[in-house]
Design a protein with these regions (language model features):
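N-terminal leader segment of winged-helix/HTH proteins
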Residues: 1-16, 76
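Amphipathic alpha-helical dimerization/coiled-coil segments
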Residues: 5-11, 82, 86-101
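N-terminal helix-turn-helix DNA-binding core of bacterial DNA-binding proteins
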Residues: 9-46
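Short, cationic-aromatic polyanion-contact patches
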Residues: 16-21, 36, 69-92
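Generic leucine side-chain signal with a strong bias for well-ordered alpha-helical environments
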Residues: 26-29, 63-64, 80
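Canonical helix-turn-helix DNA-binding module
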Residues: 34-76
Length: 101
């Protein structure tokens, strides 16, 4: 998603946080699909404590689904809940056209 890279570039250049950790997590998972927790964390600029708090809240709120890894059950893979993925896709299509979704 070019939009996410643009926003991250602006944040770096301005030395300011422009979007929430929630936004970073949602759009990372939208663009990349199911991802291990450490990959999701790397897509944010959150500290470990802030990331754990945010991902826990988003899961409890039904925005994310989580599964244990197949090869290593300690690995937690996160993904968008299907209704959330559908909503983001619909909003992107509505505001940016079909190619954006």
């Amino acid at each position: 998603m070019h939009l996410l890279y643009f926003i991250k570039s602006c944040e770096t250049d301005l030395s300011a946080r422009l979007v929430t950790f929630d936004f970073q997590i949602l759009f990372h998972l939208y663009a990349n699909g199911p991802s291990p927790s450490m990959s999701v964390m790397a897509a944010t600029n959150a500290s470990l404590a802030a990331f754990v708090k945010t991902i826990k809240r988003m899961t409890e709120d039904g925005l994310l689904v989580v599964e244990s890894g197949v090869e290593d059950r300690r690995v937690r893979n996160y993904d968008l809940a299907p209704p959330v993925r559908a909503m983001i896709s619909a909003l992107l299509t509505q505001h940016l056209g079909a190619r954006a979704a």
